[in-house]
């Protein structure tokens, strides 16, 4: 009975991912990446000339301000970019 209880506790910890980490999409290769500590936002960067295709994706700590040439879209859930 103790073994079963211990097994359930371990499975619960693994499933809950107590040290929650954010996963963001990358552009190259097209896959998700686990963000390092402190980088708690995902972002997409677009050139203002073509807002349909992102030119860069990844993890970031603070969402940059848009400029005349570049637009950033930031979010804070897994693979939201």
Curated annotation (Swiss-Prot):
Species of the source: Naja atra (Chinese cobra)
Tissue specificity annotation: Expressed by the venom gland.
Keyword Membrane attached: yes
Domain of life: Eukaryota
Disulfide links within the chain: 24-42, 35-59, 63-74, 75-80
Classification via Pfam families: Toxin_cobra-type
Subcellular location: Secreted; Target cell membrane
Assembly, per entry: Monomer in solution; Homodimer and oligomer in the presence of negatively charged lipids forming a pore with a size ranging between 20 and 30 Angstroms.
N-terminal signal peptide: 1-21
PROSITE patterns found in the cross-reference section: SNAKE_TOXIN
Protein known as: Cytotoxin 1d/1e
Recorded GO MF terms: toxin activity
Annotated keywords: Cardiotoxin, Cytolysis, Disulfide bond, Membrane, Secreted, Signal, Target cell membrane, Target membrane, Toxin
Single GO cellular component term: extracellular region
Family: Belongs to the three-finger toxin family. Short-chain subfamily. Type IA cytotoxin sub-subfamily.
Role noted for this protein: Shows cytolytic activity on many different cells by forming pore in lipid membranes. In vivo, increases heart rate or kills the animal by cardiac arrest. In addition, it binds to heparin with high affinity, interacts with Kv channel-interacting protein 1 (KCNIP1) in a calcium-independent manner, and binds to integrin alpha-V/beta-3 (ITGAV/ITGB3) with moderate affinity.
Gene3D superfamilies attached to this UniProt entry: CD59
GO BP terms, alphabetized: killing of cells of another organism
CDD domains per the UniProt record, alphabetical: TFP_snake_toxin
Keyword Transmembrane belongs to the record: no
